Amino acid sequence: MKFFIVLLAALALFTPAFGKTFTRCSLAKEVYALGVPKSELPQWTCIAEHGSSYRTNVVGPTNSNGSNDYGIFQINNYYWCQPANGRFSYNECKLSCNDLLTDNISNSVKCARKIKSQQGWTAWSTWKYCSGSLPSINDCF
């Protein structure tokens, strides 16, 4: 019996975090609750849909410059967050990239809004899928 309890405890400690998967509407509601205007919700849901499939724990494949993109909005670690491996980053959002991989998306939203204010929607490579038609969020509220 002790072995079984120890085994369960060990599995609980070493089980990888799977992150949260939002739906279009659950993401729209959460982002709105974090202060994003309703008029921007279609853009944010589109970026999340095409960048991470609405998943919080996604680390994208390595880019041509050796960087990676993190979290639900696929935020780049060369410019915006500090990677755990200590590699150089401008870290404009002043946070660890791991902070963008949690179920609490407040850091992701704050950083993404900073990116948008400095570079616009085209900062996201997935914007090409959004610029012509955006998902409706009318049925979400």
UniProtKB/Swiss-Prot annotation:
Gene3D superfamilies: 1.10.530.10. It holds the Pfam family Lys. Belongs to the glycosyl hydrolase 22 family. The lineage of its organism: Eukaryota, Metazoa, Ecdysozoa, Arthropoda, Hexapoda. Glycans are attached at residues 65, 104. Shows antibacterial activity against Gram-positive bacterium M.luteus but shows no activity against Gram-negative bacterium E.coli. Likely to play a role in the eradication of ingested pathogens during their passage through the intestine. Expressed only in the midgut where it is restricted to the first half in all larval stages. Expression initiates at the base of the caeca, proceeds throughout the first half of the midgut and gradually stops at the middle of the midgut. GO terms for molecular function: lysozyme activity. This is Inactive lysozyme 1A. It is found in: Secreted. One of its GO terms (cellular component) is extracellular region. Residues 1-19 form the signal peptide. The keyword Secreted applies. The keyword Acetylation does not apply. Disulfide bonds join 25-140, 46-130, 81-97, 93-111. Keywords: Antimicrobial, Disulfide bond, Glycoprotein, Secreted, Signal. SMART domains: LYZ1 (SM00263). Residues 20-141 form the C-type lysozyme domain. It comes from Lucilia sericata.
